[in-house]
C-alpha cells in the first residue's frame, strides 16, 4: 500500500541480517527525526493520519516490524531487545545517530527498550496508550460474557473515537492491520512474553511524555500513571479518548507532541556549571554534585552503548549460525536423498542381473 504523501519515500533497508520496509517523510527543520513504533499487527500506514497532521518541520521515520507488511519474516521469533538493536542499525543505515522515539501500545514497550539500550541515540521518548509489559500491567476490566460474545461494534474494544465514530476507525486501520492468524502477528505476541520494563523505569533518563486515554478499554489509564511515576523525567497527560486516538483523532494529540519535541532541554541549567571549565574546587557543593552526576551519566551511557554493540554482535553471530545450520541441514538432506537414490539404483541393478 503506497504512502499517500508525495513527499514521503519508501525503501527497503537491511539491518541485523533481515530486511525492513521503511517510510521516510523528510522534515523542513534541523532536529532529529521522529521514529514511530506501531501497535501489534499494524503496518506503517496505520499512523498515516498522525503523520499528515504533524508539523512538517519534523522528519518522520516509520517501519514495518519483522513479518509485518513489507518486512521480512525472521526465521525464528525475536525479543524486544533484538528489535531495538535492529532499529539502531536501521537508523545508522539511514544516516541518523540520534532520534526521538514514539511508541503506541505494543510499540510503546519497544520504544522503552530502545531508550534503555540506546541512551545516547534516543533524545526524547513519547509513550502513547502503553504499559510496562503484558505481565506487569494493570489489566482491563473483563467484558461481561454476553457482551463479549455479541460485541455490537469493533470500536467498543478500542474506546474513545473508535466507539463513537466507527467510520474513523475503519478509515484509519482497516487496510493497515494484518491477520492475527499470521506468523508475523504470532512473533509479535511471543516477543511480549515475559517482557517488562517495570524494574527498569528509573533507568530511562530521557525526557518522556506519557499520553494515556481515560476511555481506553485495552490499557487502562492507571498504566500511564505507573510509567510517569517510574520514569524520572516523565510528564503525564491524560486525554479524553481511547486506545487509538493517535490514528482516529490525531488533532487531539499532535499539538502536545509537537510542543514536547520543540521544548528546550529539561536539564539545560543543570548542565551549565559542568560546561564552564572551572575547577571543581571553585564550584559550590551543588555544582560539584551536578558535575559528578554528569560524569557518571556519561560513563553509564558509554557502558550501555558498549553493551548494545556487544548484543548486536551476538545477534549477528546468531543469525550467521542459523544460516549455516540451515545450509548444513539442506546439504544433509541432499546427501541422504542421493544416497537413497544410489541404493535404490543398486538394488534395481542387482535384481536385473
Q: What function would you assign to each model-found segment?
A:
Residues 18-72:
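Conserved HGGG/HGGXW glycine-rich cap/lid loop of the alpha/beta-hydrolase fold
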Amino acid at each position: 500500500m503506497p504512502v499517500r504523501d508525495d513527499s514521503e519515500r519508501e525503501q527497503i533497508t537491511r539491518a541485523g541480517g533481515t530486511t525492513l520496509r521503511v517510510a521516510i517523510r523528510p522534515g523542513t527543520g534541523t532536529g532529529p527525526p521522529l521514529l514511530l513504533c506501531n501497535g501489534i499487527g499494524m503496518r506503517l500506514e496505520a499512523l498515516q493520519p498522525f503523520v499528515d497532521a504533524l508539523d512538517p518541520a519534523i522528519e518522520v521515520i516509520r517501519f514495518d516490524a519483522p513479518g509485518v507488511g513489507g518486512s521480512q519474516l525472521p526465521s525464528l521469533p525475536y525479543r524486544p531487545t533484538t528489535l531495538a538493536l535492529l532499529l539502531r542499525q536501521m537508523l545508522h543505515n539511514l544516516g541518523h545517530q540520534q532520534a526521538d522515539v514514539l511508541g503506541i501500545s505494543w510499540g510503546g514497550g519497544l520504544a522503552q527498550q530502545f531508550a534503555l539500550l540506546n541512551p545516547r541515540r534516543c533524545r526524547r521518548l513519547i509513550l502513547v496508550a502503553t504499559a510496562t509489559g503484558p505481565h506487569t500491567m494493570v489489566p482491563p476490566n473483563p467484558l461481561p460474557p454476553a457482551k463479549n460474545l455479541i460485541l455490537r461494534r469493533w470500536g467498543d474494544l478500542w474506546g474513545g473515537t473508535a466507539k463513537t465514530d466507527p467510520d474513523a476507525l475503519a478509515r484509519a486501520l482497516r487496510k493497515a492491520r494484518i491477520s492475527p492468524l499470521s506468523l508475523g502477528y504470532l512473533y509479535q505476541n511471543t516477543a511480549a512474553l515475559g517482557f517488562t520494563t517495570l524494574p527498569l523505569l528509573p533507568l530511562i533518563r530521557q525526557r518522556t511524555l506519557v499520553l494515556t486515554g481515560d476511555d481506553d478499554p485495552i490499557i487502562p489509564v492507571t498504566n500511564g500513571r505507573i510509567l510517569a511515576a517510574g520514569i524520572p523525567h516523565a510528564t503525564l497527560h491524560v486525554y479524553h479518548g481511547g486506545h487509538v486516538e493517535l490514528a482516529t483523532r490525531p488533532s487531539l494529540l499532535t499539538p502536545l507532541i509537537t510542543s514536547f519535541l520543540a521544548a528546550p532541554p529539561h536539564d539545560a541549567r543543570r548542565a551549565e556549571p559542568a560546561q564552564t571549565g572551572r575547577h571543581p574546587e571553585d564550584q559550590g557543593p551543588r555544582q560539584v554534585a551536578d558535575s559528578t552526576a554528569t560524569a557518571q551519566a556519561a560513563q553509564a551511557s558509554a557502558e550501555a552503548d558498549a553493551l548494545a554493540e556487544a548484543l548486536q554482535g551476538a545477534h549477528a553471530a546468531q543469525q550467521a549460525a542459523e544460516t549455516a545450520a540451515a545450509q548444513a541441514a539442506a546439504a544433509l538432506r541432499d546427501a541422504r536423498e542421493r544416497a537413497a537414490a544410489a541404493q535404490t539404483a543398486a538394488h534395481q541393478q542387482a535384481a536385473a542381473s
